Amino acid sequence: MAALVKCFVLRPRMNRFISGNRVYERDHISVAFVVKKHFADSSEEGLAYKHYGGDDTIDTLHTSILEEIYQCRRDDVKDNSSDFMDKLVRLPHWMLKIVVNILFFLDHRGKVPFDLIKADPNYASIFLTNLGSIGLQSGYHHLNNWGTNSFFCVIGKKHLAPEWHEDGSYTVRPVIGLGLTVDERIGDGYYYSGTVRLLKKLMENPELLEQPFSTPVEY
């Protein structure tokens, strides 16, 4: 997560989104993910949503994420977005269709009430899901027509894989697969490839994340 945030700080075009057929660039970086309150089929989910900037480091991010997860797992706490959805699905079908159409109309124009979406991960710069935490490998998640999210990252389960060397030999190392889905309209392939190179550099050299995220990195 820290590596992704630093990528967005150093490569601001990754923080763009499309709304109403126009391109916008956020003035903040937000990260969101779903938190399971308990590891049980019947358990509810909470929405974690945090903002970060160039002055943050991996240490400040780690502290804030632990605090956010603790709050999300409390049974007596529910975010506004989840609470609204719970009420919405109780409406009669005909009324639900009307409300949903109105919300999509407002979303297209950037007019959805902030209280309804301030914890909605579909409005975050980075939408994360950690499938590795439930024993699954990484994959690719689609982007949604709702919201402004343009970047989805799926984290897979840690597993062993060969790392091949130039002489034909290999070393077996633990690896984690990442599935990245990006809205191709916010940039071009060259810009995306640079972002992936930077992400790889940060993952291979995590000590770089101990400095403020705004600190430049050669890659």
PLM feature segments, named:
Residues 1-219:
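C-terminal catalytic/motor cores of large multi-domain enzyme assemblies
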